[in-house]
Amino acid sequence: MKWEISKTFRFEAGHRVWKQNLTYGRGAQFTKEKPVNKCVNLHGHSYVLEVTVGSDTLSEQDMVMDFYHVKNALKGLIEEIDHSFIIDVNDPMYPELKDVAEKYGAMKIFPVEFCPTAEALAKFFYDFLKKRLEEAGLLGEVKVVKVVLWETATSKAEYKEE
C-alpha cells in the first residue's frame, strides 16, 4: 500500500479466557513454578483498538478515506461492545452468565463464537471492518492493512492478512 491511515478507539470490556491452561501448550517450557491461570477468571480491560486501512490511490479529496468515515464504520460495534462482557458461547459458564444477565439485568453480554483472547478479538475487528468496506463497495480501493488490539499497557495482539 502506498498510503495507510490509522484510527484509534478505546473501550472498556470484560472477558474470560476459559481455555487458558499455562501448564501445557506453546511456551509452557519457560515456566519453572506452578503457574496460576489468572485469565480464566472474569476480568476486564481498558482496550485500545487501532485499525489501519490503506490504498494505492487517493480519493478525489486526496485521502485514503476520511478518518470520520473510518470512525463511523466501527462506531456501532464499539458502542455495542463497550462496557460489555465478551464471552464465548462455547464457554461452560456462558449459559449461567446469560441467565444472570437476563434475570437481573446486571451484565451486558456480548456473545462471540471464539475464546475472546486478544488475538481472536483482533481478527474479529479486522473481519468486521473488511466486511463493512465490502458492503460499501470500497474493498477494491481501500484495504484493511492490520488491526492492533491493546489489552493492557504492555500487551497487544496484531492481526493482518498476508
From Swiss-Prot:
InterPro entries: 6-PTP_synth/QueD, 6-PTP_synth/QueD_sf. Gene3D superfamilies: 6-pyruvoyl tetrahydropterin synthase/QueD. Keywords: Lyase, Metal-binding, Queuosine biosynthesis, Zinc. Belongs to the PTPS family. QueD subfamily. Transmembrane segments: none annotated. Coiled coil: none annotated. One of its GO terms (biological process) is queuosine biosynthetic process. Pfam families: PTPS. Its cofactor is Zn(2+). Its EC number is 4.1.2.50. Pathway: Purine metabolism; 7-cyano-7-deazaguanine biosynthesis. Zn(2+) binds at residues 15, 43, 45. Catalyzes the conversion of 7,8-dihydroneopterin triphosphate (H2NTP) to 6-carboxy-5,6,7,8-tetrahydropterin (CPH4) and acetaldehyde. It catalyses: 7,8-dihydroneopterin 3'-triphosphate + H2O = 6-carboxy-5,6,7,8-tetrahydropterin + triphosphate + acetaldehyde + 2 H(+). The active site is at 39 (proton acceptor), 83 (charge relay system), 151 (charge relay system). The keyword Metal-binding applies. The keyword Nucleotide-binding does not apply. Binds 1 zinc ion per subunit. The active site is at the interface between 2 subunits. The proton acceptor Cys is on one subunit, and the charge relay system is on the other subunit. GO terms for molecular function: 6-carboxytetrahydropterin synthase activity; metal ion binding. This is 6-carboxy-5,6,7,8-tetrahydropterin synthase.
